Amino acid sequence: RSTWRAEARNGRGPAETLARVNRALCQDIHTGAFVTLLYAVLDPETRQLDLSSAGHPLPLLHNDGTVQEIEIYGLPLGLKSDATYQKVHCTLSPGDTLLLYTDGVTESLNLSRELFGLERLIKLVQEHDNCVAAPLIQRVLATARAYSGRAGQADDATVVVLKTCPRTVPSPGHRSSAPRPS
């Protein structure tokens, strides 16, 4: 974590940060051990989003009733010291929902050893597109837990949801140029 914090504060983009953290981890990590993560940097005013992935599940973007995966790939950290990471840049639209999750959600198994899977997750996001972030997170986690039932979850399940405001909201201190009534 210390390496990650130090590198993330240097202001490099997500891809370069992952490459630098990966090189450091490859020197310190046990053979066969690895770390997955997704690094996202958002400019809240412009809704510009830069993403880089180190073996993490693909993020989901819900926009205008459709859910699509943001295709971004990279090796998990700690596997290959000269691994390179790509950066994907996108602009979020007003009302978009970005869902980040660990494989503990989609790889939840029921008693018949069937995966919860990506299709169920996408359907869940579509069905709850009007939810604010916290209830959507709770719904996804509760549904994955319920799917596992008595089998229990074998892996950690984490969900992060980012929802953009449906319309532009002025930033604090922004002054409107509209004339004042006299």
Residue ranges and their predicted role:
Residues 1-182:
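Conserved subregion of the PPM/PP2C metallophosphatase catalytic domain
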